[in-house]
Amino acid sequence: MAGGRGVAGGGDVAPAGRGGRLVDPQDVAGVLLTPGASADRDHHTLVALEAALAPLPVLRMHFANRERGNPGPERAEAAIPYLRERADAWAAELGVEPGRLVLGGRSFGGRMASMAVAQGQPAAGLLLLSYPLHPPGKPDSLRIEHLPDVDVPTLAVSGQRDPFGTPDELAHHLAAIPGPLRLVTVPGDHSPADPPVVAAVLDWFGRSPA
C-alpha cells in the first residue's frame, strides 16, 4: 500500500506508518549505505543488506575521515557534502540520475543521509537503520529539525529497546516526515540482529528473503 496512511503491527517485526513499500521499487537503480559514527563500511548489517539486495547494486561507503585513516566520528558539516558527492559520482558511474538511488545507513550514517535529502539531494528513498533520535538518556536533545524537509519514501527500522529512541518516540517525531513513511520495530537495542532488519528492508522493496 505504497503512499497510503495505514497502521499495522504484530509479530516479531511490527510495521506502522503511512506507506507499506517504496512507491516504485522497480525504478531504484542502487542503494548507498553509510555506517554509524564509530563504524565503517564493513559493518555486518551493511554487508548483510548488500548480500540480500543482490543483484541490485549496493555501495557501502566510508565517510571521508575513515578514508584518511581517522577512526573517530565524522563531523556533520563534512559528512553531508561528502555523502552527496559520493552519491552523485556513483550515480554517474551507474549511468543513472541521482534520484534513482536509495540513500541511508545505520545510526549517524542514516541521519547524515536524511540531512542530505533534506538539503536537496535527490533520492528514490531513504533508509534509516537505528535512527539516533536523541542521545541515550537525553530525550529532549532531539535531532529532528530537518525532518519536515524529507519528502521521499522513508523506512525506519529500530530495536524495541533502542536507547537512542523508543518506538513511541520514533513514531511521534518521524511523523514530521511528509513523504511516505514506514516504521518497523524489531527485537533488540541499538544494534539489532541482522535477519529481522534485512527482512524489513526486503519487504519495503517488495521482495521476499531468499
What does each model-identified segment do?
Residues 122-133:
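A conserved short beta-strand
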Residues 105-109, 113:
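Gly/Ala-rich beta-loop-alpha elbow adjacent to hydrolase catalytic centers
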Residues 103-105, 129:
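Short beta-strand immediately N-terminal to the catalytic nucleophile in serine-hydrolase-like folds
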Residues 150-151, 156-158, 162:
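Short beta-strand/loop motif that positions the catalytic acidic residue
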Residues 11-100, 111-112, 194:
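Serine-hydrolase catalytic machinery in alpha/beta-hydrolase-like enzymes
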Residues 160-165, 191:
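Acidic catalytic loop of the alpha/beta-hydrolase fold
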Residues 188-197:
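Catalytic histidine-centered segment of alpha/beta-hydrolase-like enzymes
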Residues 64, 183-189:
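Short glycine-rich catalytic loops that host catalytic nucleophiles or stabilize transition states
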